[in-house]
Amino acid sequence: MDVIEGNTVVSNITKIVVVVARFNKAINNHLLEGTIDTLKRVGQVQDENITIVWVPGAYELPLVSQALSISNKYDAIIVLGTIIRGITEHFEFIYKSCNFGLSNISISNLVPIGLGLLVTNDIGQAVERIGIKGNNKGSEAALAALEMINILKTIKNNN
C-alpha cells in the first residue's frame, strides 16, 4: 500500500510568498510573525526565499494571489487576513468571496495556498487565534503550505 504524506521541511530553494491584508493590521501582524517563525524554524526556509506582499484588505487577497500563482515564481502562497463581523452583510460577502476565490486559484493553478484568514464574530475571537494564548493561525497556515509543497512534489515525482 502506498501512503503519501508530506513533511514540513522543504528544500533550500523553496520560495514562499505571504500575502497580508493591511486592514486589521494589528491582528495580521501577529499572524505574519507566526507564519515567518514557522517557515524559518520548522520549514527551514531562508529569508531570501520569503516574499511579503501587503494588500489593502481581505477582498484583494484572491486577485494578488492569482497574479502571484501564475508568475510561477513561488512554490506556495500563504494568505493572512482578518474579517470581523460587523452590523452589515458586507462581512459574509467578503469572506465568501475570499474563500471561493482562493480555493479556485489553488485548484486551477496547482499552487498550495496556506489559508490564514480569520473570520470571527468579534475582536476577542481574533485575538484568541493569533498566538497570545498559544495557537497562531498564521503558523498553522505555514505548516499546511509546507506540507502541501511536499505532497504535490511527491505526486509529481511518482507520475
From Swiss-Prot:
Signal peptide: none annotated. It is an enzyme of class 2 (transferase). 5-amino-6-(D-ribitylamino)uracil binds at residues 23, 58-60, 82-84, 115. It catalyses: (2S)-2-hydroxy-3-oxobutyl phosphate + 5-amino-6-(D-ribitylamino)uracil = 6,7-dimethyl-8-(1-D-ribityl)lumazine + phosphate + 2 H2O + H(+). One of its GO terms (cellular component) is riboflavin synthase complex. Keywords: Riboflavin biosynthesis, Transferase. InterPro entries: LS, LS/RS, LS/RS_sf. The active site is at residue 90. SUPFAM superfamilies: Lumazine synthase. Pathway: Cofactor biosynthesis; riboflavin biosynthesis; riboflavin from 2-hydroxy-3-oxobutyl phosphate and 5-amino-6-(D-ribitylamino)uracil: step 1/2. Its EC number is 2.5.1.78. It comes from the Bacteria. (2S)-2-hydroxy-3-oxobutyl phosphate binds at residue 129. One of its GO terms (biological process) is riboflavin biosynthetic process. The keyword Transferase applies. The keyword Transferase applies. One of its GO terms (molecular function) is 6,7-dimethyl-8-ribityllumazine synthase activity. Belongs to the DMRL synthase family. Catalyzes the formation of 6,7-dimethyl-8-ribityllumazine by condensation of 5-amino-6-(D-ribitylamino)uracil with 3,4-dihydroxy-2-butanone 4-phosphate. This is the penultimate step in the biosynthesis of riboflavin. Forms an icosahedral capsid composed of 60 subunits, arranged as a dodecamer of pentamers. This is 6,7-dimethyl-8-ribityllumazine synthase.
